[in-house]
Structure formats: structure tokens, C-alpha cells
Amino acid sequence: MEIMYSNKSNDIIKNNNITGVYGDKLDLINSGFDFYGIEYDDEWTVKRFLNGYKLKIDNNILNIFSELEISYSLLKRKIKDLSKGQFKLILFVYIILNKKNIVVLDYFDKGLSYKYKKRITNYIKSKYSGSLIVISNDLVFLNSLCNYLIVFKDGNIMFNDEFNNIYKSRVKIEYPPIIKFIRLANNNNAKLSYTVDNKELLKDIYRSVR
């Protein structure tokens, strides 16, 4: 299950923030989290899954579909007939509608097209409120979403701080090439800001050599 939820808070998660986890869900379970999956039947239509047995479709569903650019025609489709990307979008809509205490996206970005990933990322950054945990080993994806980062290694927490501080730390993880470049440059007194945006990096380099 790529979207789960928890009704139990935990001291390592900052309330009402988006926390990235570089590790896996077992690390969180071993840290005291209880997770629940979303129950559904493959034979249900999307409308049945999101709207229950009500005849009239809830306006909140229509509004979220519009904001995420999801075709209303999907409401008539059965869950089993959705593509993987479409199903992830529908699960995300379900989570928005049901407002769980803590939502967990477990490698939600895996296999997700750039188009769908961008829609979800933009919605989370602009609209989502509440506590969200994003589990992934893609540091660029985590950086695009998260305020805080937790790094697990062998079941132990190696880092739990504001996201950008990971780049200044000595924690050994697989950094994206752009971060490796900035770290190398800063070791030679370049004083560049950490970013995963190539355009922002070029601007910073230009400012530093003026």
C-alpha cells in the first residue's frame, strides 16, 4: 500500500509539517508508529470509492478533481481499470477528503509519471494542511516537498532536522549530482546555497562571481 495513515502522533514527527523519511516504513514502525491501509474493492467504481452510495457527487470531490486536473470520466471507471498513476491520484484524493491525522506516502513517487508527480507536489505545497510523511530514497523528490528530513540507517535515526541541514551534515547517503557539485564547491570556499534546481544554482554561481 503506497498511501497509509496513522491516528497516533509520534515525537519524531513535527506536527503540521511535511517530513521526508530516507529509509522505509519498517523504520517508522520500529519507532512506534501504527499504520493503517486504505480499504477498497477493485470492482468498485471511483465514484463508489470516493462518494460512497450517495447519488449526488460531493462538490469537494469535483473541486479536488479540477485542481489536480483529473478527468471527471474517471468517476465511472472501476478501480481495477485505472492505470497505476491514475490510481495513485485517486488514493490521494481519498486522503484529502478523509483528513487523517498523519498521512504516509510510502514510495508514492515510484512509477509515477512526471505529470502526475508535479500535480501532487504542487497541491501538497499550496493546499495541503496537516502532518504528512513522505518515504522515499529520491532526495530530489523529498527536497521538493519536505520541510524536515529523517534519515534512518540500520534501524537507527542518523538525522532528524530541517531538510537543508542534511547537506551540511556528515551523514552518508546517496546525494544527487547537483548536491555533490555544491558540496565539492563549498569545500573549496564557494559558499553556494544548497538547491536541487539547476536554474537556481546557475543564478547563485553568477552572483558569486560578480
How should these model regions be labeled?
Residues 13-59:
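ABC ATPase nucleotide-binding domain signature region
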Residues 64-80:
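Conserved ABC nucleotide-binding domain
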Residues 91-93, 120:
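Hydrophobic anchor residue at the start of the ABC signature
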Residues 104-109, 113:
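Walker B catalytic motif
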Residues 113, 142-144:
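A short, surface-exposed alpha-helical micro-motif characterized by mixed small hydrophobic
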Residues 135-137:
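H-loop/switch region of ABC-family ATPase nucleotide-binding domains
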Residues 144-151:
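Conserved catalytic segment of ABC-fold P-loop ATPases
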Residues 156-179, 183:
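Conserved beta-strand-loop-alpha-helix hinge in the C-terminal portion
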